[in-house]
Design a protein with these regions (language model features):
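Non-catalytic, usually N-terminal nucleic-acid engagement modules in DNA/RNA processing proteins
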Residues: 1-201
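Glycine-rich phosphate/ribose-binding loops and adjacent secondary-structure elements
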Residues: 179, 191, 195, 203, ...
Length: 261
């Protein structure tokens, strides 16, 4: 449960209560991709010296190795890591979609090859939720497509006709992707509810956050936020802002923050 403590202009300070403890917002999430911080930092150091409130772990990498089922057998990520504070797991979507030459997108999900051993893996909304449930994280992220920034193909010396062609193609792709991501979110929510009701689920109070997409197109971003807000998720994130120019990132945040739940 989120509690708003104070606001100042567009900024707000609050706290988020979870089954694994409370963290203050805004907060910095330390990244432990494979359930550990690089550099030999122990969980004790992370808590006592670095004052880490939330650790972020990577669903895709943990699924590939050591395997989410192995981690479940060990009691979940908290026991695996010797960590008793909140953990957020991403959906694996960003990593999957970054494997551009190794994956194929379908309505059901994504087929791709492991970057480790080349084996074929299928991941869709249900599979992502199942993996994250096996990990037992505090907060799970919905499976979405992290859309490539096709606008980066535009160069200063390009003529207007070529620019418009790229923009139109990027817009159409982004729109179709957003629509699919909404459908995937419905499937994620349904599967998470099912998993949280099972007797052998590690964290029966696992939270699920929806992710806003829409590339750099204002109308797509706003429409997508409106659609996913209807599902009344436990929280929301702004996705796909990785690699865009800083001014575009700030612009997207400026138009989205006032309308986010």
């Amino acid at each position: 449960m989120y509690t708003l403590i104070k606001t100042e202009g567009k900024a707000r300070r609050g706290q988020f209560e979870t089954v694994h403890g409370t963290f203050q917002t805004p907060c910095f999430m330390n990244v432990g991709t494979a359930a550990a911080i690089k550099g030999g930092i122990s969980s004790i150091d992370l808590k006592n010296d670095l004052k880490c409130q939330v650790e972020l772990c990577n669903t895709y990498h943990l699924h590939v190795r050591p395997g989410d089922k192995v981690i479940k057998q060990m009691g979940g990520l908290h026991k695996f890591m010797n960590w008793d504070k909140p953990i957020l797991t991403d959906s694996g979507g960003f990593q999957v979609f970054s494997l551009a030459k190794l994956r194929k997108i379908k309505e059901e999900g994504v087929c791709f090859n492991s970057h480790v051993d080349g084996r074929k893996i299928f991941m869709g909304p249900e599979e992502s939720m199942q993996i994250q449930s096996n990990l037992g994280s505090t907060i799970a992220m919905a499976f979405d497509e992290c859309i490539d920034n096709h606008m980066a193909q535009i160069t200063p010396d390009m003529d207007e006709k070529a620019k418009n062609r790229i923009i139109r193609k990027a817009y159409d792709y982004s729109k179709n992707s957003c629509d699919r991501t909404v459908r995937w979110l419905y499937r994620c929510k349904e599967e998470m509810a099912r998993l949280n009701s099972l007797p052998d689920t590690i964290n029966k109070h696992q939270l699920l956050f929806g992710i806003n997409q829409g590339s750099v197109f204002d109308d797509l971003r706003l429409r997508h936020m409106e659609e996913i807000a209807k599902l009344d998720m436990d929280g929301y994130a702004v996705g796909g802002l990785a690699g865009e120019p800083t001014e575009e990132m700030y612009h997207i945040l400026d138009i989205l923050c006032p309308v986010m739940p």
